[in-house]
Amino acid sequence: ISLSYQQATLADTKEVNVANSYNSSDTYLPEALSWTLETSPNYYKVLGESGIVENLFPPKGQIVYGGLDSLGRTLTVRGTLTFNNVLGSYNIRKDFKRSKAETLSGWLGNKNGEVYVIKGLGDDSYQGYFWNKSHLIADSLGGDALRVNAITGTRTQNVGGRSGNGGMRYTEIKSQKWLEAHRDGYLYYEAMPIYQGNELVPRAVVVSVLSSDNTINEKVIVYNVANGYTIDYNQGTFSANQ
């Protein structure tokens, strides 16, 4: 079950203010700009404990999308996820609508037939599309294919290298496995895009996860970069480094 942005704002003003102060993206911007392949070859880094504020989250089984800011950029998404969220996603792939209203900020798409090589360490290189419509809460965790639940992300931000278990997939896989093993439990799951100034494409996403038994309790930054390429985060364009 998902709640729309309008429904989410029924929370009282005090709670909304707490949410905004709790999640200041500027806090994480220096880290978002510090990525190197050598230190984070799978495009994520564990920052520490989740710091989850439980009263900011919806009832069990629900997801609240934070909507869009004045520039049309996706904001923080929070969900209190259960096994039923995962169960409802089995064998279902939701496609994003191709409409102007659902176009992600900074999204220019991929040219037909264009294939790019993003080199990793050793043999872990990716070959394929450069950009993905990257979910904040994955469809495998019950997230919807909506503009308010996605960003313009590099392929490596979405899944890491060729192995496909890095980037956003790191917390997604861990969370799905935990929910499948703890069918009576629940997870607080939060994904916050990190923007620099008025740029339309985020520099990173900070994902915070806390399980009801506290065996998962971590905050992870996922870098929206691609080794060997320079990205224009204002325009959503990129070029290969010489």
Feature names for model-found ranges:
Residues I1-E54:
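N-terminal, intrinsically disordered, polar/charged segments of Gram-positive cell-envelope systems
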Residues L29, S40, F57-P58, M192, ...:
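Intrinsic-disorder/low-complexity coil detector
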Residues G51-I63:
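Early extracytoplasmic/domain-onset interaction patches
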Residues I63-S70, T74-Q242:
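Domain-level detector of nuclease and nuclease-like folds
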